[in-house]
Amino acid sequence: MEQDVVAQTTVGQPYTAGTWVVQSGQEDEFIERWTAFTSWAKREARGALSFVLIRDVDEPTRFQSFGSWESAADVAAWKSTPEFMLYLGRCRELCDDFQAANYAVASVITS
């Protein structure tokens, strides 16, 4: 994990999140597509800081994703691009369920 990103996290900082339930047998393809999606975002989207995808150990078709951003305006601009819908759609077509959410950091504890 990029320690410097965590250390720079501040209260109120925007995060995007997704809960993904992937079709059985499609997990590796989903990880590849999600990685392409977020690699594009990191390169091209203003204010994109970091992305992480975590997998449920007990239910391996269930994933959570998080993206940290400089501002809510950056998130809105990212979501308004045609590429966003294309990449998101490629991930979603491998899923039985997907829920998106927008968050703001409420508390930060670092070592």
Regions found by a protein language model. Give the residues of each.
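Short, surface-exposed ligand-recognition loops at beta-strand->loop->(often short) alpha-helix junctions
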Residues: 21-31
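Residue-level signal for secondary-structure boundary sites
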Residues: 26-28, 73, 111
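Glycine-rich beta-strand-turn "strand-cap" elements at beta-sheet edges
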Residues: 1-13, 50-61, 87-111
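An amphipathic, aromatic/His-enriched active-site/gating alpha helix that lines ligand/cofactor pockets
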Residues: 2, 36-49, 68-102
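Short, well-ordered beta-strand segments in beta-rich or mixed alpha/beta enzyme
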Residues: 14-21, 50-79
